[in-house]
Amino acid sequence: MVRVKYIQIIILFIGFFLYPFFPPLPFANSEGPAQYIFSYVTRVIDGDTLELADRTRVRLIGIDTPELHFSRKLLRDSERSKKDIAVIQSLGRRARDFTRKLCMGKKVRLEFDIEKTDRYNRTLGYVYLEDGTFVNAKIMEEGYAQVLTVPPNVKYAELFLRLQDRARSDKRGLWQRGTHMN
């Protein structure tokens, strides 16, 4: 019995000293290949939040559409932009309708970044349609969102900034004359 204990202690010490010389296993590597989930969009809650077939709520990373529902954020946005709450909600409906037309009922691939959930327990993701359309980018490109960068989820931040600048200069979506969000 004492001999078995002695052998276990020796193995433990050998493992402890050899550990630094071996690379981590693939699943322990946070910078490994992206992880994906495939599902169907069953509901578009607002312009930047979807619900999947398994009832998972997905907040699209990197973009922020105008608020549709009454909230503290809606009040802050109204104060910041000097726009009436009803105007912001109207812009929010336009963004939601665009997102709904783009992906409602369609099969999607969800890609993750560093953090997988937000403080509201929504799944954070980049969403792609079967044809390869990058939903987050398409919403930004068509002018229905502003860039929202929340580190550490910054994988496509530069792309989103370029798309926002182009949509603004082309006066697309919410940047049309008289409706812009700023």
Regions found by a protein language model. Name each.
Residues V2-N182:
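Small beta-barrel nucleic-acid-binding modules, primarily SNase/OB-fold domains
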